[in-house]
Amino acid sequence: MTEYKVWAFARSAAPNLPALEEQLAEVMREADRRGYIIVNSCMEQKYGTEFWRPALFAMLAAVQQGRVNAIMVQSLDRLSHDITTLYRILRFLQNYGAVLITTE
């Protein structure tokens, strides 16, 4: 069984901080329930069509450096609404042997 070292990630464009915090809390609860090791977490209030997002790049840097081997989000659209951007992120994870896990 693979031991997942997880970066929990939440994103929303809506200016509703409590909802964003709850989204992250849900991801972290599910990671804990599944027995994953939560290495780090972040949340960002950005549009899902934007690619140049500081929290996203911090998370990808952690993958590249081998600090995490899994990204956990509520759903795929939390990473991006743009299919090309989502593909780029998934290829990046694949290239570094990391996986994407959703709570849904």
What is the meaning of each model-derived region?
Residues 1-104:
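Short, structured surface patches at the beginning of a domain
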